[in-house]
Every structure is written in C-alpha cells, then in structure tokens.
C-alpha cells in the first residue's frame, strides 16, 4: 500500500541510516505491559515505521541530523522559478510542491530557497503588494519543518542562464522605463537592457516620486510586515537582489536574443545618461574631462576574447594604463555604492531583531580568469585582475552590513571547462573564500548549473564542507528542485550528498550506502513529486 506524504517522510527519517535507526530504536521507551502479544504488535508497528512509534524515532534522527549540521554545512534547495503563479495569489502545482517538500525533508535538507518576484508581488501598482501565494508556501514549509531562504528578486526572470520562464519587472516600472529608456542599462552601441534598473538612477525619484532604492526598501518592509510570524523561525535568510539574476553585477553578458555567448568577454554597461553624468563628474574631478565621455571604445564586443581587443590585451592593454585604472575604479565603485545603498535599506528593515540573516549573491565569472586582465569580470563590475583583488572590497562592503557572501560555481572543476578560454573556477572559488575570510564575512555557495553526478557533489563537498571549521561555508543552496532531481539514481546520490555535507565530508561510498534506505523508503513519494512537477 502506498505511503501518504506524512508516512513517507517519517519512514525516510527512520531509515536515514541503518545505524541511526538502530540507535534511535534503542532509546524509544518500550511498553511495560506483560502481554507478549501486545508487545509484539507494537514492535511490529515500530519496525514497519507506523506513526505510533516512528515519530519518536524520527525525532531522534532529526535531532541527530541537526546536531551533525551544526558541525557541517546545511543544504537548501532552490524552488522552481515559477513556484508562485504570475498573479501572485496561489502556488503553481500545489500537489507537486507538497510532495517535493516532504521528500526534501526526508533527505535531511535544511530548507528551500524561493524567489519572491517584485514583478509578481507589486505588479498591480506602486505599494500594492500581493503575497498570497508566498504565504501558502511559507505555511507549507513550516508544516513540513523546512527553513526558507527568501530572495528579494528585483530583476527580470528571462534572458539568463537557466531562466525557463519569463517574469518581467512590475508593469508600472516597465512603463516608466519605456518612457525614459535611460533608466535601463545601456552599452556603447545603444543597446538597452531591461533586466534590472540602472544603478545610475538609484537616488533619482523616477518612479512616481520614489527612487529605485526606496522601491526596493518599501518592498522589503512590506515583506517583513507580512511575514513577521515566520521570520527567524521559518524564514531564516533574506537574500537581497542587487542586479541581473539577483547578483551584484552589471548585465554585461546577457543571453537574450543571442547577444552574448559563453565564453565571450561581455561589454561595459555605462552609457545611459545617469551613468554618463556620474562618469563625467568623476573625470572632471580627476582633472581629465576628456575621460568622461563614455567607456572604452577599444574593448571589443560581447563575444570577443581578451586578445581580440586593444583594451584587454596582455599586460600593455588599456586596462593597465592610467585611463584604464581611472575608468575601472569608477565603474566598480559605482557597483559597490549600489550595494551599500540597497543593503542599507535591507538592514534598516531586517536588522532590528527580525531573526533572519541577510545575504548577497556574487557571480562566479570564471572564464578568462587565467588571463592578465580578467576581462569578463571587469565588464561585470568586479575590478579583479592579475595584479588586483576585486573581491576583497565587495567582502568588506558586505561585512559593514553583517551580510553573508553567496558565491556560485562551487561545483565546477577547471579541467571540465574549455581550457582555451583559461577557465579557472576552482582558483576563483579559493580567491573569493580568502576574501570572505579576510573580511570576516560568512561564505555560502551555490552550483551555477544543474548537476546530479557524484563528481560535482565531490567538488562541492571539498570546497564547502571537507575543511577546517573556520573555513567551511555557512550554507549551500542546490540548484534546483525539478523532475531530474527526483530521478531514482539522482535522488539517491543527492541524499548521500546532503549527508556528506552535514557530516563535513564523510566518504561518498559510505554516504551512498547509508542513503539507500532513504531512497527505498521514499520511492513512491519521490515518484509522485517527479510526476507532479512534469505536469
């Protein structure tokens, strides 16, 4: 007979490992009745993991897992991008969400991450917020016993790696951007990018009397007030969106309409009138007004490589000249100041005992990392070169606000990437980890692309958990919940991965052996989740 959701989750908890189950069973108080028949019946029920006895076992296993996680790295799982309907009033695929959350809980996952889309919640007009669909999700997570990382997603969904749905910015925001195209990031050829409002107008009251930063802060305040009863208990982290894909960066490598293709260097985004005005003032203050007319004109196009350009070439390119230093310092400083402004708003909302930590995501731009100029990082706003650490200033900015640095591409290995593009994700992760450590901020991680194989899991465990306590990541968020995750083989490996993370790097073989019981116990539940997610 198929188990229902609660029974499946309880059964999985019982079978998390054979050893855990045996140890847990040994502490369950047995009845004092002298009736051997009654005792036998109760023992059979316990062995079958029926709720009457299994709850005690499950509580013991959960407590053991929680204790283990204190020494390891908690794992969260990203929800589908379209978890909440575009009208904001309901969950999409409610049955699939319920089954999926129960399965994740059974695997020992700490919680979920969900995008709280500005374009959904405030779509009807300024200050008109509809969180109904998210309330349903939070209640479901609380009932299941999962924590939540809530992402304040102030960007458009669509046009980036992994974007499977389209969720634009709020309609009233888009209307203002259509009236004034300079509210959008703009490249040197006049191409506009509507993924995220240009940081150049952060302090301009361009949205019906409000600045963009005020819009973001008001949204976060509305979220806090609406979910006050969940904060600190169920909602344990607020990730603050800072740019395209929710990352603190410029939209320098947009995939939409084939503009950019990996591993192109991207393009600077500083040609809207607000950015040009700032650049002009900075150039005049430097005593070089001729530098204030726009960004470099010899930096190539989106799909060039560094050596194709004059600006990014070798040691003698424009990036290493006095002008290059001036421009790149200004460009990266504008991004840092944007982060300061938005984080100041976030801490004013969530900083007074709200109970949830704040985090910011930084992009893992690993291609051409082995070159001197690090061109793709420069166009994205990270002034990181062979001779300069571009991540330490970001980490220090986050430290001033007590925020966690969330970094991507943790699953990648150098040799898996095209070597001709000098991709070095492992070295990049090490550099960012060192910057976080030096600045005294917590480092969390994500995988940049969906991976379900043991090799990727090994890499994450090595980078995040299998190290000295002070160097471990504070959390890892797994991309992403979907039918592929619930494929039987993928699921078994994932359960083992979660166990290894919680135990700070236990061997893969032992973890996979222990995960076999969970995979068996949750088979029907996982199948239900996979089928429902495909519907």
Curated annotation (Swiss-Prot):
UniProtKB keywords: Carbohydrate metabolism, Chloroplast, Glycosidase, Hydrolase, Plastid, Polysaccharide degradation, Transit peptide
User: Any idea which residues the transit peptide spans?
Assistant: 1-36
Q: How does activity depend on temperature?
A: Optimum temperature is 35 degrees Celsius.
| GO molecular function ontology, one term from the record | beta-amylase activity
SUPFAM superfamilies recorded: (Trans)glycosidases
State the superkingdom. Answer: Eukaryota
What is a biological process (GO) this protein takes part in?
A: polysaccharide catabolic process
Q: Name one GO cellular component term.
A: chloroplast
**Which reaction equation describes what this protein catalyses?**
Hydrolysis of (1->4)-alpha-D-glucosidic linkages in polysaccharides so as to remove successive maltose units from the non-reducing ends of the chains
**InterPro entries linked:** Glyco_hydro_14 (IPR001554), Glyco_hydro_14_CS (IPR018238), Glyco_hydro_14B_pln (IPR001371), Glycoside_hydrolase_SF (IPR017853)
- pH behavior: Optimum pH is 5.5-6.0.
At which positions is substrate bound? 115, 155, 163, 361, 366, 408, 447-448, 480
Recorded hits in PROSITE patterns, A to Z, give: BETA_AMYLASE_1 (PS00506), BETA_AMYLASE_2 (PS00679)
Record Gene3D superfamilies? Glycosidases
Q: What class of enzyme is it?
A: hydrolase
EC nos: 3.2.1.2
> Which Pfam family is one of this chain's hits?
Glyco_hydro_14
Q: List the catalytic residues.
A: 247 (proton donor), 446 (proton acceptor)
| Cell compartment(s), UniProt | Plastid, Chloroplast
User: What does the UniProt function comment say about this protein?
Assistant: Possesses beta-amylase activity in vitro. May be involved in cold resistance by mediating the accumulation of maltose upon freezing stress, thus contributing to the protection of membranes.
- Similarity comment: family membership: Belongs to the glycosyl hydrolase 14 family.
Protein name as annotated: Beta-amylase 1, chloroplastic
Source species taxonomy: Eukaryota, Viridiplantae, Streptophyta, Embryophyta, Tracheophyta
Q: Which gene encodes it?
A: BAMY1
């Amino acid at each position: 007979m198929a188990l229902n959701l609660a029974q499946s989750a309880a059964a999985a908890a019982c079978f998390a490992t054979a050893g855990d189950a045996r140890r847990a069973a040994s502490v369950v108080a047995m009845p004092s009745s002298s009736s051997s028949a009654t005792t036998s019946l109760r023992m059979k029920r316990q062995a079958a993991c029926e709720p009457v006895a299994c709850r005690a076992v499950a509580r013991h296993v959960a407590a053991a897992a929680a204790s283990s996680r204190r020494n390891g790295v908690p794992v969260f799982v990203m929800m589908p991008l379209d978890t909440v309907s575009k009208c904001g009033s309901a969950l999409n695929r409610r049955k699939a969400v319920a089954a999926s959350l129960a399965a994740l809980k059974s695997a020992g996952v700490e919680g979920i991450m969900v995008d709280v889309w500005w374009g959904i919640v405030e779509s009807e007009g300024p200050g008109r917020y509809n969180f109904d669909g998210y309330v349903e999700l939070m209640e479901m997570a609380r009932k299941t016993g999962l924590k939540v990382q809530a992402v304040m997603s102030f960007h458009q969904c669509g046009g980036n790696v992994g974007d499977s749905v389209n969720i634009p910015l709020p309609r009233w925001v888009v209307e203002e951007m259509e009236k004034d195209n300079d509210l959008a990031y703009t490249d040197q050829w006049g191409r506009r990018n509507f993924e995220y409002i240009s940081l150049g107008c952060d302090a301009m009251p361009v949205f019906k009397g409000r600045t963009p930063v005020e819009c973001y802060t008001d949204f976060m305040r509305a979220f806090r007030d609406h979910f006050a009863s969940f904060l600190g208990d169920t909602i344990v982290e607020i990730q603050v969106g800072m740019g395209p894909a929710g990352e603190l960066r410029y939209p320098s490598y947009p995939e939409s309409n084939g503009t950019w293709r990996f591993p192109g260097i991207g393009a600077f985004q500083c040609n809207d009138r607000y950015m040009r005005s700032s650049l002009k003032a900075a150039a005049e203050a430097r005593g070089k007004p001729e530098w204030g007319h726009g960004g470099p004109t010899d930096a190539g196009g989106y799909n060039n490589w560094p050596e194709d350009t004059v600006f990014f070439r070798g040691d003698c390119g424009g990036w290493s000249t006095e002008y290059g230093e001036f421009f790149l310092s200004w460009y990266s400083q504008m991004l840092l100041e944007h982060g300061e402004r938005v984080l100041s708003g976030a801490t004013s909302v969530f900083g007074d005992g709200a109970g949830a930590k704040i985090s910011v995501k930084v992009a893992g731009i690993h291609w051409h990392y082995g070159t001197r100029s690090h061109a793709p990082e420069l166009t994205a706003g990270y002034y990181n070169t062979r001779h300069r650490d571009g991540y330490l200033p970001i980490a220090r900015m986050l430290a001033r606000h007590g925020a966690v640095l969330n970094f991507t591409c943790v699953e990648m290995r150098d040799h898996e990437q095209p070597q001709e593009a000098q991709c070095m994700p492992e070295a990049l992760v090490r550099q960012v980890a060192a910057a976080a450590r030096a600045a005294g901020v917590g480092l969390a991680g994500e995988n940049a692309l969906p991976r379900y194989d043991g090799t990727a899991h090994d890499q994450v465990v090595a980078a995040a958990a299998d190290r000295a306590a002070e160097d471990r990541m504070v959390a890892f968020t797994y991309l992403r919940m979907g039918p592929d995750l619930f494929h039987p083989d993928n699921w078994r490996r994932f359960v083992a991965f979660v166990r290894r993370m919680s135990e700070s790097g236990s061997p893969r073989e032992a973890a996979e052996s222990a995960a076999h019981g969970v995979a068996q116990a949750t088979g029907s539940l996982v199948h239900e989740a996979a089928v429902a997610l495909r519907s």
